[in-house]
A protein has these predicted regions:
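Elongated, amphipathic alpha-helical interaction scaffolds
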Residues: 1-141
Length: 141
């Protein structure tokens, strides 16, 4: 059994501390603007540990921070303190579950808002000496 950390041992890589620091919409907005290099007018909603499960037999996800802005765009902000080999597929799955939750039956695909998945790591996940990796879903031709 892992020993529980004391409050003074917590860092931003711990879920509790991460949420306590990032639950402030102004602070969260500035962090997202800096990382994504975008302008966000106002954040509307910040919730911690949001669980999404789209079907009875589907894999559930727990979003560390689920954030929306005044345009309806969605930001999923995650903190990851252990090495994971399947990061690109995990991000793909998270984004797909978020997208499924956005549309109601019969809604047009144009109603899908922008969504971003941001992971904070305490290590370089791809070992390329970078502090930011950007992935886009796009056609190459």
């Amino acid at each position: 059994m892992r020993k529980r950390k004391t409050l003074d041992q917590l860092t931003l890589m711990d879920d509790y501390m991460f949420y306590q620091v990032m639950k402030d919409p102004g602070r969260m907005r500035r962090v997202l603007e800096w990382i994504l290099n975008i302008t966000i007018t106002k954040l509307e909603y910040v919730v911690a540990q949001k669980t999404e499960k789209e079907g009875y037999d589907s894999k559930a996800i727990r979003l560390d921070l689920y954030v929306t802005d005044d345009r309806g765009n969605i930001y999923n902000v995650e903190v990851q303190s252990y090495k994971e080999d399947s990061l690109p597929k995990r991000i793909r799955y998270y984004q797909s579950v978020i997208d499924v939750d956005i549309l109601t039956p019969g809604a047009k695909y144009e109603k899908l808002k922008k969504s971003y998945v941001v992971f904070f790591y305490n290590y370089d996940p791809f070992e390329r000496n970078r502090y930011i990796y950007t992935f886009e879903n796009r056609c190459l031709e």
